[in-house]
UniProtKB/Swiss-Prot annotation:
Annotated source species: Homo sapiens (Human)
Enzyme Commission number, as recorded: 3.1.3.16, 3.1.3.48
SMART domains named among the record's database cross-references: DSPc, PTPc_motif
Pfam families: PTP-SAK
Location in the cell: Cytoplasm, Cytosol; Nucleus
Catalytic activity entry: O-phospho-L-tyrosyl-[protein] + H2O = L-tyrosyl-[protein] + phosphate; O-phospho-L-seryl-[protein] + H2O = L-seryl-[protein] + phosphate; O-phospho-L-threonyl-[protein] + H2O = L-threonyl-[protein] + phosphate
Major localisation: cytoplasm
Protein known as: Dual specificity protein phosphatase 23
Stated family: Belongs to the protein-tyrosine phosphatase family. Non-receptor class dual specificity subfamily.
UniProt superkingdom: Eukaryota
Protein purpose: Protein phosphatase that mediates dephosphorylation of proteins phosphorylated on Tyr and Ser/Thr residues. In vitro, it can dephosphorylate p44-ERK1 (MAPK3) but not p54 SAPK-beta (MAPK10) in vitro. Able to enhance activation of JNK and p38 (MAPK14).
Domain Tyrosine-protein phosphatase, chain residue ranges per copy: 7-150
Gene Ontology MF, one: protein tyrosine/serine/threonine phosphatase activity
PANTHER family with a match to the protein in the record: TYROSINE SPECIFIC PROTEIN PHOSPHATASE AND DUAL SPECIFICITY PROTEIN PHOSPHATASE
Length: 150
């Protein structure tokens, strides 16, 4: 039986979710129970007990706390989500608390998936996950991604 990880919520139901750092084996089981088969970890250190659920593939994109992702990290994240979703598999993404780095990646994915302008994607993520995208540099990363992809 799984236990909901802190700050878990769907951004695209059944396809893409954000969460804080999973700390218990039961957090990973919760993700598996919901169909999440890929976990993108944005922390510099890997999440504890990540080997407790062999059905969950861990993808590491190390980003320092309060920093924006690099363009190649955003591109890799989008690729992971697209490939997993094409197979009917959901993706979870986490940083430490699930706000800054996580929110930035989620907003970039909304730019790509829904064709939203950067400001609209940021506003939507903040509506769904209040407190997300914590720094000017993280906001700027979403705007730069939008400029690169429009």
């Amino acid at each position: 039986m799984g236990v909901q990880p802190p700050n878990f919520s769907w951004v695209l139901p059944g396809r893409l979710a954000g969460l804080a750092l999973p700390r218990l084996p039961a957090h990973y089981q919760f993700l598996l129970d919901l169909g999440v088969r890929h976990l993108v970890s944005l922390t510099e250190r890997g999440p504890p007990h990540s080997d407790s659920c062999p059905g969950l593939t861990l993808h590491r994109l190390r980003i320092p706390d309060f920093c924006p992702p690099a363009p190649d990290q955003i591109d890799r994240f989008v690729q992971i989500v697209d490939e997993a979703n094409a197979r009917g598999e959901a993706v979870g993404v986490h940083c430490a608390l699930g706000f800054g780095r996580t929110g930035t990646m989620l907003a970039c994915y909304l730019v790509k998936e829904r064709g939203l302008a950067a400001g609209d994607a940021i506003a939507e993520i903040r509506r769904l996950r209040p407190g997300s995208i914590e720094t000017y540099e993280q906001e700027k990363a979403v705007f730069q991604f939008y400029q690169r992809t429009k």
